[in-house]
UniProtKB/Swiss-Prot annotation:
Any one GO MF annotation of this record: peroxiredoxin activity
Protein name per the record: Alkyl hydroperoxide reductase AhpD
Gene encoding the protein: ahpD
Family: Belongs to the AhpD family.
Uppermost EC category: oxidoreductase
Species, as recorded: Anaeromyxobacter sp. (strain Fw109-5)
Keywords (A to Z) from UniProt: Antioxidant, Disulfide bond, Oxidoreductase, Peroxidase, Redox-active center
Single biological process term from Gene Ontology: response to oxidative stress
Gene3D superfamilies hit by this protein: AhpD-like (1.20.1290.10)
Amino acid sequence: MSPVDRLREALPDAARDVRLNLQAVLQGGALTEGQRWGVAVASAAAARQPALLSAVLAEARSRGLDSAAEDGLAAAALMAMNNVYYRFRHMVGKPGYTEMPARLRMGRLAQPATSRADLELFSLAASAINGCEACVRTHEDVVVKGGIGEEAVHDAVRIAAVIHAAAVALEAGEVAGGHEAVSAA
């Protein structure tokens, strides 16, 4: 049984739909396997649920998708910073802040382990979870202009939504005391 399958089985009964959706979104669709698992890693890291991230990382690496996994982790880390900063600028809406340089290092965006378009796709998923409208719009535009179609973008956001829901369900199950902590091993 794969790490993600074990994790799915650990989801509480209240999250049956999430369990089924988690299986569905990680199969087939308009994304390549690397894109699918890079999005899953970025989403799991952005959702901040250790057992979920551990399972998704183990699954991606077991499939030989180390570059996608590394870019997924990089995207989540960068978006944790950028989404706060750019969401602030967008929410305040004052031209003065928009004109100030960010002065935040983002060199990894220029040096992906996969491709620029894939790293942007992973960043889009993390940004959707983090709720940065300006970031979502920017990443979606770059991804589509980079040759990844809207159907693939839609699949990526579906993965992000389900991964986020799985993180919430796992945490709720732990708090409710109905399930033991999940291990990816």
